[in-house]
Every structure is written in C-alpha cells, then in structure tokens.
C-alpha cells in the first residue's frame, strides 16, 4: 500500500467543502484495483461507489453476443457508481479497471445519506454526472464518425488526463477492445503516432512524448469533453491543473 496516499488525490473529494469531506473521510476505504478487475457487471446491484486516485476505470457497454466497447473512462477526476445517487441502483454498463492503481471505496448507503444531507455534494455530483453524460455522447459520435487514428488520440488524451503521468501500461489488444475496433487498426494507428514522434510504444507501455502534437492530431471530441468538464466543474479542474503543473 502506498505510504503517501490521500483521499484528496481524487479531485471530486478534494473539491468538497471541509465539513462534508471530514464527515466522509473516516468511512472511505483505500482499496487496490488490479488491472482487469470488474467492479460491477451490467445489471448488477451496486453496493459501493469508488473514487479512483491512481487507477483508471472503463465503463463498457456489453452486447448480447459478448462484444463490448468503452462508453466512458473515469479516473481521479470522478466517481464510479453514479446510479446509486441517481436512484437507479443498477446500470447497463460494466466497470473494468483499465489501469491498475488505487481507489477509495464508500458503501452505497453512506453515499446516499450524504447526498441527501449535503447540498454541496448534490451540486458537485450532479454536475459531474452531466459531464460524464457528455463524455458518453461524444464517445458515441466519435466511434461512428472518426477514424481509428483520431479515436486513439482522444482515448490516450482522456486517459492521461486521469493519471499523474505521461505513461500508460496498456496492450494494443486491450485498447482495441476498449475502442471496439480490430487490433490491426490500433497497431497501424499507434505506428503512425510513433513515426510522427508523438508517442513511444514498447512492450505494452505507451509514453506520450509530444502532448501538444497529440492534441493537434485528435478530433474535436477530446476538446468538447474537456471544455464541458471544465465548465461544469471548475473547482475540480483547478485540482487537475495543479497536478498537471507538478507533472511537468
């Protein structure tokens, strides 16, 4: 377990007023999230919410034939399990750990109690949910209308925004599953980005070496998602900006 770990590494928790944060912190449980761990399956009853700190979780829509595609990615900016406070209790998506790390887990009844009690938490989580819905909608548009190259750029940028690093540990096969495309398409797209000097890929490890260049190659979808997130959650975006400066 990491020696210097704080629930405030999750930007949603860090954006809570001190009073609300202190009411929650003793009930937050630090848990490891191994790569590939399934936090919940489609249609399952949600018992906990998760606030990632150093992990990334993919929300996948699973078809009847078993095929799946990512509809959103959640990291240290967000929360896994929005259905709990939205009143649905279950969700049609599957939550799978995309990048191993840690998260803080909170029992569902405690989250709902605080959501009902605290107007500040209501506003924060509802604004986050709207930003998450924007990401889902834009991902659907991107998957339908943009090339695999552009989708990969968007995916890499959104993932890096949720990590305190410029490096991802990720196989091309896993990326292909997330994007819902053939592995060969990801191999070709990653090769183009590497030849352009934007990324370095080796043995399941992707390092972004030219982020401005990667953003220039991405379609509009990344900027749409980020702009809406920053508009709805300026307090959370502030914590992200500080983390990005520390990373440089």
Where are these regions (language model features)?
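Cyclic nucleotide-binding regulatory module and flanking cytosolic helices
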Residues: 1-34, 79, 84-85
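A generic structural signal for short hydrophobic patches within well-formed alpha-helices
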Residues: 21, 79, 111-112, 214
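Residues that scaffold the ATP/ADP-binding catalytic core of kinase and kinase-like folds
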Residues: 24, 60, 82-83, 114, ...
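Cyclic nucleotide-binding regulatory domains
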Residues: 38-99
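Polybasic "coupling" helices that flank or enter modular domains
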Residues: 98-100, 114-182
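Phosphate-/nucleic-acid-contacting segments
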Residues: 158-248
């Amino acid at each position: 377990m990491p020696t210097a770990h704080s629930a405030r590494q999750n930007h949603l928790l860090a954006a809570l007023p001190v009073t609300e944060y202190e009411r929650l912190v003793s009930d937050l449980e630090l848990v490891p999230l191994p790569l590939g761990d399934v936090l919940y399956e489609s249609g399952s009853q949600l018992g906990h919410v998760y606030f990632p700190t150093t992990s990334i979780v993919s929300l996948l829509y699973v078809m009847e034939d078993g095929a799946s595609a990512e509809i959103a990615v959640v990291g240290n900016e967000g929360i896994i399990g929005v259905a709990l406070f939205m009143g649905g209790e279950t969700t049609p998506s599957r939550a799978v750990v995309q990048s191993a790390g840690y998260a803080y887990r909170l029992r569902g009844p405690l989250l709902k109690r605080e959501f009902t009690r605290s107007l500040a938490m209501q506003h924060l989580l509802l604004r986050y949910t709207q930003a998450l819905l924007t990401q889902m909608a834009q991902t659907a548009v991107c998957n339908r209308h943009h090339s695999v190259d552009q989708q990969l750029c968007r995916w890499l940028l959104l993932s890096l925004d949720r990590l305190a690093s410029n490096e991802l540990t990720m196989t091309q096969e896993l990326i292909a599953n997330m994007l819902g495309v053939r592995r060969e398409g990801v191999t070709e797209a990653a090769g183009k980005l590497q030849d352009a000097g934007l990324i370095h890929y080796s043995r399941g490890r992707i390092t972004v070496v030219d982020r401005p260049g990667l953003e220039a190659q991405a379609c509009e979808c990344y900027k749409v998602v980020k702009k809406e997130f920053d508009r709805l959650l300026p307090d959370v975006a502030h914590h992200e900006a500080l983390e990005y400066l520390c990373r440089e």
